[in-house]
C-alpha cells in the first residue's frame, strides 16, 4: 500500500498532535466548480456520474487540484443504498431526488431487505479508483446517510419540508418505522464496511434530518441506529485505525449523547459554538466544523475573521477538523473557498505545538 504523504486529517480525528488544523469541505466536489459542471455534462445525468468510475474519480480529485485540502471524499450520493433496495431512485429536473416506490404500505415494508452489496459495486470500484488516483496525497473519506435520514426519503418518496408522512408513521405505527430503520442500519453497516475494504480511510455518517425530531424521538429513531452501525464497523484497515465521524444537522442539542456512541468525531452544524461543544464532549471525541457555508458569500476579510473566531473558540490542541457546518452552496465563489482553506492553514498553526 502507498503510504500517506499527508495524514493530518486522520491524526486530528484521533486527537493526536498535528502541526495545523486540517480542512476539507462537505460537498467539495460539486456545482460551485466549473470543472465539475463540465464533467457532469459529459456524464449525462447525476446518477450516471455516480455510476461512472472514471468520472466519479475525476470529480473527487478536482477540488484537490484547486485547493490545498487535507482529505478527499468519495463522490456519490446517500440514496444509493435505498436505490439498491429496489425503490427506483430518479432525479426530477429542478426537484431533487425522488423514489418511484415509496414505503407507505405495510406489505412493502415487510418485503424490505438488506440489498446485495454487488448492486453497489460501482461505489466500491470508485473508492478503489480514487485511492489509486490520490497516490497517497491525502486520505479518502467514505460515507453513507444515517438510517433515519434514508428513511425520510424512502417513506416520503423524496425530500420534504415537514416530514408529515414519516412522522405519522413514527407516532401511529412505530413498529413499521423500526423495521425500516433496522434494515437500513444493517445495510449501511455492510455498505460502509465494503467501502473500507475497498480503501476508504475514514467514514462519515450523515444524519441530515435527525434534527427535525423531538428529543425522545431522536434518541429512539435516529441515535439508536447510528450507534448500531458504529458498533458494527471495521475500525482497523491497512494497519491503522479507520475513524468514524457522525454528523447530525441540527444535532447540537444531543452532543453529550452522541459523544457516547463510540464514534471518533462529531460533525457540528454552523449553529453551535465549537468551544462550548468542546467543553460539553470533553476528551471523548474530536470535533469537525463548523463554518457557516453562507459566510463564504462575505468578503475575503470577513471570511478570515470568521475562521479566526472558530479557531480561537476551539482553542489550543488537536482534535479539530475544520469544515463547513453543511455542504458548500452551489453559488459559492471558488476563490472564496480558496481563501477559507489557506486561512485555516495559516492561522491554525499558533494553536498547535509548543
UniProtKB/Swiss-Prot annotation:
GO terms for molecular function: uroporphyrinogen decarboxylase activity. GO terms for biological process: heme biosynthetic process; protoporphyrinogen IX biosynthetic process from glutamate. It is found in: Cytoplasm. The keyword Acyltransferase does not apply. This is Uroporphyrinogen decarboxylase. It catalyses: uroporphyrinogen III + 4 H(+) = coproporphyrinogen III + 4 CO2. It comes from Neisseria meningitidis serogroup B (strain ATCC BAA-335 / MC58). Pathway: Porphyrin-containing compound metabolism; protoporphyrin-IX biosynthesis; coproporphyrinogen-III from 5-aminolevulinate: step 4/4. Substrate binds at residues 27-31, 46, 77, 153, 208, 326. The lineage of its organism: Bacteria, Pseudomonadati, Pseudomonadota, Betaproteobacteria, Neisseriales. The record marks 77 as: Transition state stabilizer. Its main location: cytoplasm.
Amino acid at each position: 500500500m502507498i503510504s500517506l504523504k499527508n495524514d493530518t486529517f486522520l491524526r486530528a480525528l484521533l486527537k493526536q498532535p498535528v502541526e495545523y488544523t486540517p480542512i476539507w469541505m462537505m460537498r467539495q466536489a460539486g456545482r460551485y466548480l466549473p470543472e465539475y459542471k463540465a464533467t457532469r455534462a459529459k456524464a449525462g445525468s447525476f446518477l450516471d456520474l455516480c455510476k461512472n468510475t472514471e468520472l466519479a474519480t475525476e470529480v473527487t480529485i478536482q477540488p484537490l487540484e484547486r485547493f490545498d485540502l487535507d482529505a478527499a471524499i468519495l463522490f456519490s450520493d446517500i440514496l444509493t443504498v435505498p436505490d439498491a433496495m429496489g425503490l427506483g431512485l430518479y432525479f426530477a429536473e429542478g426537484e431533487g431526488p425522488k423514489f418511484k416506490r415509496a414505503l407507505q404500505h405495510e406489505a412493502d415494508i415487510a418485503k424490505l431487505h438488506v440489498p446485495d452489496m454487488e448492486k453497489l459495486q460501482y461505489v466500491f470500484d470508485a473508492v478503489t479508483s480514487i485511492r489509486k488516483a490520490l497516490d497517497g496525497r491525502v486520505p479518502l473519506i467514505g460515507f453513507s446517510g444515517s438510517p433515519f435520514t434514508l428513511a425520510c426519503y424512502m417513506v416520503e418518496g423524496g425530500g420534504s419540508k415537514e416530514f408529515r408522512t414519516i412522522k405519522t408513521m413514527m407516532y401511529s405505527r412505530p413498529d413499521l418505522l423500526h423495521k425500516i430503520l433496522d434494515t437500513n442500519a444493517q445495510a449501511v453497516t455492510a455498505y460502509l464496511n465494503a467501502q473500507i475494504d475497498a480503501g476508504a480511510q475514514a467514514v462519515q455518517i450523515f444524519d441530515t434530518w435527525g434534527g427535525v425530531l423531538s428529543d425522545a424521538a431522536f434518541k429512539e429513531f435516529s441515535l439508536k441506529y447510528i450507534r448500531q452501525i458504529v458498533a458494527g464497523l471495521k475500525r482497523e484497515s491497512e494497519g491503522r485505525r479507520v475513524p468514524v465521524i457522525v454528523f447530525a444537522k441540527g444535532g447540537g442539542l444531543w452532543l453529550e449523547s452522541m459523544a457516547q456512541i463510540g464514534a471518533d468525531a462529531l460533525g457540528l452544524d454552523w449553529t453551535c459554538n465549537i468551544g462550548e461543544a468542546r467543553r460539553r464532549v470533553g476528551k471523548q471525541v474530536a470535533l469537525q466544523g463548523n463554518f457557516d457555508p453562507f459566510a463564504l458569500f462575505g468578503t475575503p476579510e470577513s471570511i478570515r475573521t470568521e475562521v479566526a473566531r472558530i479557531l480561537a473558540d476551539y482553542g489550543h490542541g488537536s482534535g479539530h477538523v475544520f469544515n463547513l457546518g453543511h455542504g458548500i452552496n452551489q453559488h459559492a465563489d471558488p476563490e472564496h473557498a480558496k481563501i477559507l482553506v489557506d486561512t485555516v492553514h495559516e492561522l491554525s498553526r499558533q494553536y498547535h505545538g509548543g
